[in-house]
Amino acid sequence: MFTLNKFLLLLFFLGTINLSFCEEENAEEERIDEPDETDVEVEKRFLPIIAGIAAKVFPKIFCAISKKC
């Protein structure tokens, strides 16, 4: 009976450690999947610049193509 208790205790201990490692890996994967704050900042900086340039260039291109200026 004593050896069975030791075995069950060892099994429980190893299972707890294994579960702990799985939770750490899942947390790390979630951190990897989330976009970095710097990436979001870069997108916020360049998107208005590109939109502004497109707003200035598009009417000129449309005017040149349709020739209805």
From Swiss-Prot:
GO terms for biological process: defense response to bacterium; defense response to fungus; killing of cells of another organism. Coiled coil: none annotated. Disulfide bonds join C63-C69. It holds the Pfam family Antimicrobial_1. It comes from the Eukaryota. The keyword DNA-binding does not apply. The keyword Secreted applies. GO terms for cellular component: extracellular region. Residues 1-20 form the signal peptide. It is found in: Secreted. Residues 21-43 form a propeptide. It comes from Lithobates pipiens. This is Brevinin-1Pb.
